[in-house]
């Protein structure tokens, strides 16, 4: 393994993990798109900075709630964001809850939504490129504003691959939804 590749390799619990990401700064997204965002009470502190960032990048953002730290049920907010995506009013959606897990589960219950939980940039672009993900879920207790910025940049700059192997797989996911 070349020295640079070895330097970038990490080990977690003695097992080789993904290479460290490059130090490149997140870049504003190249194409502007309408987005829908929502959060529960646990995600509320991160939602405001995320909305400000997305608007600074030129996106239009529809805020589907919640609007305070008062407890709410995340499936209700997830449904609102998913409805925006499915109706075409948003090209992609973003959900923020405590860990992101509940939001991802809720999103994947909605036919036509492909949700992914992403706390790193590789997953954030790969899920769009290979799986045509249209709903990004993040955990406010897991990542802070800076990592969220990097994840959002990767997610929003990614495009679904034109390769037939990935398109075939996404079609199969659609068929599974019909069963």
Regions found by a protein language model. Give the residues of each.
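Glycine-rich phosphate/diphosphate-binding loop of Rossmann-like nucleotide-binding domains
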Residues: 39, 43-55
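A short beta-strand-loop structural module common to alpha/beta enzyme folds
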Residues: 60-71
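Alpha-helix C-terminal capping segments
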Residues: 84-89, 104-112, 128-132
């Amino acid at each position: 393994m070349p020295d640079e590749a070895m330097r970038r390799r990490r080990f977690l619990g003695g097992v080789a993990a993904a290479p460290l990401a490059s130090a490149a700064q997140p870049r504003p997204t190249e194409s502007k798109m309408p987005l829908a965002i929502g959060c529960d009470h646990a995600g509320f502190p991160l939602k405001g900075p995320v909305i400000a960032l997305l608007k600074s990048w030129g996106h239009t953002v529809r805020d589907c709630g919640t609007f305070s730290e008062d407890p709410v049920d995340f499936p209700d907010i997830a449904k609102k964001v998913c409805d925006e995506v499915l109706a075409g009013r948003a090209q992609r959606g973003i959900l923020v809850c405590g860990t992101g897990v509940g939001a991802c589960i809720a999103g994947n219950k909605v036919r036509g939504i492909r949700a992914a939980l992403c706390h790193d940039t590789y997953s954030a672009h790969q899920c769009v490129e290979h799986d045509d993900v249209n709903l990004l879920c993040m955990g406010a207790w897991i990542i802070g504003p800076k990592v969220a910025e990097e994840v959002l940049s990767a997610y929003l700059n990614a495009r679904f691959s034109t390769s037939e192997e990935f398109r075939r797989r996404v079609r199969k996911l659609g068929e599974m939804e019909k069963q």
